[in-house]
């Protein structure tokens, strides 16, 4: 299992991005969370197999139809949390 952190930029707040992201994560079997950031971006932490996280990354690059993703940054997640499901954090 790998853990990755993504920061999604663009028109990604106020458009249902967190809801759709959680739905896609559950569909793919991803664990972790999604959370709005003060700068207008969205942070996503994803835990799963290489294949699951790669498919999730591909989805995040596009986002849901209601959003406009302009940039996606990816880095190793070093937060130390262990996830058992995927949640929307406030």
From Swiss-Prot:
SUPFAM superfamilies to which the protein is assigned, alphabetical: Acylphosphatase/BLUF domain-like (SSF54975)
Membership in a protein family: Belongs to the acylphosphatase family.
Protein name in the entry: Acylphosphatase
The organism's place on the tree of life at top rank: Bacteria
Gene symbol of the encoding locus: acyP
Enzyme Commission number(s) from the entry: 3.6.1.7
UniProt cross-references to Gene3D superfamilies, sorted A to Z: 3.30.70.100
UniProt keyword Ligase, yes or no: no
Name of the top EC class for this enzyme: hydrolase
Any one Gene Ontology molecular-function term assigned to this protein's record: acylphosphatase activity
Active site annotation, chain numbering: 18, 36
Domain Acylphosphatase-like residue range list: 3-90
């Amino acid at each position: 299992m790998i853990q990755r952190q993504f920061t999604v930029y663009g028109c990604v707040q106020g458009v249902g991005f967190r809801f759709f992201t959680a739905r896609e994560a559950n569909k793919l079997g991803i664990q972790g969370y999604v959370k709005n950031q003060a700068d207008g971006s969205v942070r996503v932490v994803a835990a799963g197999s290489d294949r699951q996280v790669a498919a999730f990354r591909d989805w995040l690059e596009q986002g849901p139809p209601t959003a406009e993703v302009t940039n996606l940054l990816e880095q190793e997640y070093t937060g130390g949390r262990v996830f058992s499901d995927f949640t929307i954090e406030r």
